[in-house]
């Protein structure tokens, strides 16, 4: 996503916002995403195909900016707050509980410098997003972290659920 605001042209900056959505909007969003009928797809790999990890994903918008999900409209409150100039991809990741806080491989989301990545956390648990510089962002319900899409990062799976 390319941001319209002044944050878009700041290099190597990261923005963390707690309580990103108002409580009612947050609850409405999570109810849909966490319901048993929400369609998740198995992916053999997290950072790369067949990297030894797996996750479930839901693609709302593909790499070309095409809407691919009938659930896209549930993202309107998030998109309204983010106010992107353009959307390149929107994907939800669902990871499963592991025995330890397993780290996936470090990766970048794009080589393009102007594109920002936004990670929105639907629940609180002991998983996180870890950056190459050692910075760790804990998974906290209704938190969002916005950073340069070419900044190396990885997911750290949850091992205990604290909801």
Give the residues covered by each predicted segment.
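Non-heme Fe(II)/2-oxoglutarate
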Residues: 2-86
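A short glycine-rich, His/Asp/Glu-containing loop-to-beta-strand
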Residues: 80, 84-99
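Conserved short histidine dyad/triad with adjacent acidic residue
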Residues: 94-111
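A short beta-strand-loop-beta hairpin characteristic of the jelly-roll/cupin
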Residues: 101-103, 113, 121-140, 156
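Short beta-strand His + acidic residue motifs that chelate non-heme Fe in jelly-roll/DSBH
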Residues: 105-107, 152-159
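Conserved metal-binding segment of the jelly-roll/cupin
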Residues: 137-153
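Conserved small/polar residues in nucleotide/adenosyl-binding loops
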Residues: 161-163
């Amino acid at each position: 996503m390319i941001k319209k605001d002044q944050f878009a042209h700041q290099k190597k900056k990261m923005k963390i916002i707690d309580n990103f959505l108002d409580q009612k909007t947050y609850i409405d969003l999570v109810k849909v995403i966490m319901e048993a009928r929400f369609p998740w797809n198995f992916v053999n790999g997290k950072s790369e195909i067949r990297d030894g990890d797996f996750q479930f994903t839901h693609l709302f918008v593909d790499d070309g900016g095409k809407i691919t999900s009938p659930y896209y409209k549930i993202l309107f409150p998030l998109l309204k707050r983010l106010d992107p100039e353009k959307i390149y991809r929107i994907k939800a990741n669902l990871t499963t509980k592991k025995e330890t806080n397993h780290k996936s491989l470090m990766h970048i989301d794009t080589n393009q410098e102007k594109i920002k990545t936004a990670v929105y956390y639907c629940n609180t648990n002991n998983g996180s997003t870890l950056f190459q510089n050692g910075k760790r962002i804990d998974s906290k319900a209704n938190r969002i972290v916005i950073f340069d899409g070419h900044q190396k990062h990885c997911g750290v799976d949850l091992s205990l659920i604290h909801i």
